[in-house]
Amino acid sequence: TLFRSGWFAVHARDLPWRSPDCSPWGVLVSEIMLQQTPVVRVLPRWREWLERWPTPADLAVAPTADVLTAWDRLGYPRRALRLQEAARAVVGRHDGRVPADPAALRALPGIGEYTAAAVASFAFGIPETVVDTNVRRVIARAVAGEALPGRSLTRAEMRRAQALMPEDPARANAWNAAVMELGALVCTARSPACDRCPLAETCAWVAAGSPPPVEVPRGQAWAGTDRQVRGAVMAA
């Protein structure tokens, strides 16, 4: 439905890591930065990062203090340290080139199932199933009729996502990006724009009357947490 409606072609955001000219390293950096950080905050940092360290080899030898400073207020600065560890592993194990093989990607420091699948799909065109929070929410609503997915990804969810992917590799990778974009822009956690959704006519959640979630999600407190303290220290 996403492809038949042409929704993604019209509404996809023009993000630099989606450009055909973006290197696999650029895609990897974007995926790490986008973990729990909005696109609007990532964009300027991503550009600065790639200008300063355009290859894994460049980041591998950078002073750690410089890496943390450049990460600035993206939050969760441990991600910056893990990214540098991954860069060093890429240099040591893969001659400085980000590997295409999902298993090799998962073996890098700080790279889990999702990030490995995303890099394999978006950087190398390998039809891995990419399931993030946005994808889980779209599938939960459109297929299962649930307002929100559970707290943790289940095997059943993963099988469902895999079954929905087109068989053609090119379409499968476009599908990954399209469903993620739909969840980010339309099928949002709060106040979804169902009137603008290309899946609304067949959405199980809409058909059920858009019932509220069984469990209302609660955000993590900020004031007084270790994250707040770390952010204040880095900003000083």
For each feature predicted by the language model, list its residue ranges.
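Short, small-residue-biased leader/transition segments that mark boundaries at the very start
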Residues: 1-2
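Catalytic cores of DNA base-excision repair glycosylases
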Residues: 6-228, 236
